[in-house]
Curated annotation (Swiss-Prot):
ATP binds at residues 100, 290-294. Belongs to the RNA 3'-terminal cyclase family. Type 1 subfamily. One of its GO terms (biological process) is RNA processing. This is RNA 3'-terminal phosphate cyclase. Signal peptide: none annotated. Keywords: ATP-binding, Cytoplasm, Ligase, Nucleotide-binding. Its EC number is 6.5.1.4. Pfam families: RTC (PF01137), RTC_insert (PF05189). GO terms for molecular function: ATP binding; RNA-3'-phosphate cyclase activity. The active site is at residue 314. It comes from Thermococcus sibiricus (strain DSM 12597 / MM 739). Catalyzes the conversion of 3'-phosphate to a 2',3'-cyclic phosphodiester at the end of RNA. The mechanism of action of the enzyme occurs in 3 steps: (A) adenylation of the enzyme by ATP; (B) transfer of adenylate to an RNA-N3'P to produce RNA-N3'PP5'A; (C) and attack of the adjacent 2'-hydroxyl on the 3'-phosphorus in the diester linkage to produce the cyclic end product. The biological role of this enzyme is unknown but it is likely to function in some aspects of cellular RNA processing. One of its GO terms (cellular component) is cytoplasm.
Amino acid sequence: MRVIDGSYGEGGGQILRTAVALSVITGEPIKIINIRAKRSNPGLRPQHLHGILALKELSDAKVKGAKEGSTELEFYPKSTRVRHVKVLIKTAGSISLVLQALLPAMVFAEEEVTFEITGGTDVAWSPPVDYLKHITLYALEKLGIKVEIEIRRRGHYPRGGGFVIGKVYPWGTKRPLVARTFDKIYSFEGISHAVRLPSHVAIRQAKAAKEALERVYPSIPIKIHEEYYEQGKDPHFGPGSGIVIWANTDVLRLGGDALGERGKPAEIVGREAAKALIEQLGPRHAVDKFLGDQLIPFLTFAGGDIWVSEVTKHLITNVWVVEQFFGRVFEMEGEIGKPGKVRVVKKVEL
């Protein structure tokens, strides 16, 4: 049985998501020890359990230690013959983080897999589902991966209640991804939403983001969709707001996002998202810092060479987890917090 040290690096949920997904892909049982050992509240938290239990359902696995506070987890996968996965997160736990665990394993299923997940679509410390849908999936398509995601209802902290459905197709031809530098930004797009709030919140967020982008990129077209609901016809548990914006370049899309909070003016939310995106575009590297770590499990099997706007701890952790399974796969350049490069030197064939 392969043993993974859950305290490596940041020692957070990233190790769990990637290690258990790779266990499902390879069919190899794993034991994760020292889970979140360096944290003030060590062991599994509820948000980590959702991803693990979803992967358990997908692979009909036997699991030991999948409970809150547990610092060790054993996972024995069987096969990915399940056709539908349903995950119910009772809080505003992140739907995106559950999908980050599920997607790498789902693409290796023999047939299409559908999913439905209830929880948080737009919550702190995780990419919004809009980011996953418009930026992550766009990049995965270049690798030959087809995934459909539909946001039926948004969910915000603390009430959650977001509802996302989708379909993952078996990964056929694995195409390497070469995404080094971009030359041209064709346009900016985005989605600014406000639920159980006045429509002007979404409108002001979008306007502030547009103005901030125009100051730096005056000649590039910008189109930000404003999403809001009539009082009495709003299906959300809410209230909540947020904005995701992205640059369409000649290579991939780079993104930035921000969340509304009680007492935080909509203009600040819009400007925060624009600032995050502008920072990602500065080095002219084709992969933004939020996407880099998400691509690692897929690049392992497809090959490629990506240049990231910023090396993050999450990126380094994901490379480390992959190499616990397969030995040396990647070559990396760059320090944490600086632009960097990640190249596959030994693609894994299953």
